[in-house]
């Protein structure tokens, strides 16, 4: 089935799912699964923090737009995630977690990706939302009229660019509290570990307790997936593989300023905040130790993925150990995560780490946000490129 038709077929199915839907024409079934996050205490006022470290948490300020604090945003705490698997699979022996990009609120573009991965690998694909993204974000953050007012206010601020109703909510939140970038990632990390524990205990329907775990990470989802692979929580990911698409660079080598992602002031604030943290290593170590206490995690791996120059030896030592289980694809015209940034990170700058990295250039207009556009004029070329990427991905993860 050609890509644009597949996209429309899957979107209709996902949009109308209640709990489980079988698509006989595509030989797959889709499930909507319930999840309750246990990581909400990260955002509570009462959470104890190291003496003198209040600036790192910046928590909690009154929640932008909804009038409540982050830890009380119910959509972020209790939500559904999707899974897709081949029809007739009573108990999946393999899982691929698919993690999305920054500031995304709809899964639409990922449906064909998940379908092809399931069809070609025979594994169950789990589309799991990062904290405060997708259906974990309040509806108000997608209200175009409300967000347009915020965008206009932000556009009138000095030294700002690329403000839009699409990025208004996340830009306002990150400029107000840049540490949210870290805390939302940490909550998602805890959620992943909780879901994995549930799988191992046999609580997840149609998934074997001993199922293998692999990852497909796009954009900031690649950043998160790489962190998981480096950390290897509870030694669960010793044999896991990761495919990176349009991602894989340290944060300082990304250029997320876009009307679809975040505006200039938000990007600058986040970058400056973490640069200041990294420049005071003893204080940063204390803060990270506080948040990672009780978790089987090397607290410095997160810091090593923020900046090329900080924790470089730690990052490259770990990448040497796991590079054979990573395959990355970058796009020539990707201005958000340029191939040069991906190469510098995954191959160690001078190329002394043999991580597989393919750099592609498609035969139609594309960008980071829309690598496979729904475009009647270029539908044949888009289908060809989509199938190439999915075939390479599936071959590595099968």
Regions found by a protein language model. Name each.
Residues 19-90:
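N-terminal cap/lid segment of alpha/beta-hydrolase-fold proteins
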Residues 143-206:
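Alpha/beta-hydrolase active-site loop
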Residues 217-219:
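Conserved alpha/beta-hydrolase "nucleophile elbow" surrounding the catalytic nucleophile
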Residues 12-45, 131, 149-160, 165, ...:
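Low-complexity, serine/threonine/proline-enriched polar segments
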Residues 203, 207-211, 215, 226-296:
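Hydrolase active-site cap/lid region
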Residues 84-161:
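Short, surface-exposed "cap/lid" segments of acyl-processing enzymes
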Residues 73-77, 181-192, 378, 382:
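Phosphate/oxyanion-binding active-site loops and adjacent basic polyanion-contact surfaces
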Residues 263-398:
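Serine-hydrolase catalytic core
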């Amino acid at each position: 089935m050609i890509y644009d038709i597949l996209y429309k077929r899957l979107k209709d199915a996902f949009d109308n799912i209640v709990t489980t839907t079988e698509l006989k024409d595509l030989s797959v079934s889709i499930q909507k699964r319930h999840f309750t996050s246990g990581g909400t205490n990260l955002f509570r006022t009462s959470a104890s923090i190291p003496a003198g470290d209040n600036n790192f948490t910046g928590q909690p300020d009154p929640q932008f737009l909804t009038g409540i604090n982050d830890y009380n945003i119910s959509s972020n705490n209790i939500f559904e995630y999707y899974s897709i698997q081949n029809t007739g699979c009573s108990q999946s022996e393999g899982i691929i977690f698919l993690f999305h990009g920054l500031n995304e609120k709809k899964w639409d573009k990922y449906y064909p990706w998940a379908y092809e991965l399931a069809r070609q690998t025979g594994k169950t694909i789990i589309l799991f939302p990062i904290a405060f993204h997708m259906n974990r974000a309040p509806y108000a953050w997608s209200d175009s009229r409300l967000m347009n007012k915020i965008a206009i206010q932000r556009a009138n601020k000095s030294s700002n660019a690329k403000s839009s109703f699409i990025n208004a909510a996340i830009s306002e939140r990150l400029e107000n509290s840049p540490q949210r970038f870290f805390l939302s990632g940490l909550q998602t990390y805890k959620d992943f570990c909780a879901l994995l524990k549930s799988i191992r205990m046999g609580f997840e329907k149609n998934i074997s307790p001993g199922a293998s775990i692999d990852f497909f990470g796009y954009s900031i989802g690649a950043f998160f997936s790489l962190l998981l692979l480096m950390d290897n929580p509870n030694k669960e990911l010793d044999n896991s593989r990761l495919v990176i698409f349009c991602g894989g660079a340290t944060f300082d080598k990304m250029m997320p300023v876009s009307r679809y992602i975040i505006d200039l002031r938000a990007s600058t604030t986040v970058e400056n905040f973490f640069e200041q943290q990294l420049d005071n290593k003893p204080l940063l170590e204390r803060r990270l130790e506080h948040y990672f206490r009780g978790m089987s995690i090397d607290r410095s791996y997160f810091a090593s993925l923020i900046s090329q120059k900080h924790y470089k030896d730690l990052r490259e030592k770990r990448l040497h150990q796991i590079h054979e289980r990573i395959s990355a694809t970058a796009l020539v015209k990707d201005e958000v995560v340029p191939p040069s940034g991906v190469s510098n990170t995954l191959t160690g700058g001078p190329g002394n780490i043999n991580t597989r990295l393919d750099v592609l250039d498609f035969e139609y207009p594309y960008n980071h946000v829309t690598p496979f556009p729904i475009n009647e004029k270029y539908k044949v070329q888009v289908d060809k490129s989509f199938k190439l990427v999915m075939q390479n991905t599936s071959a590595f993860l099968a």
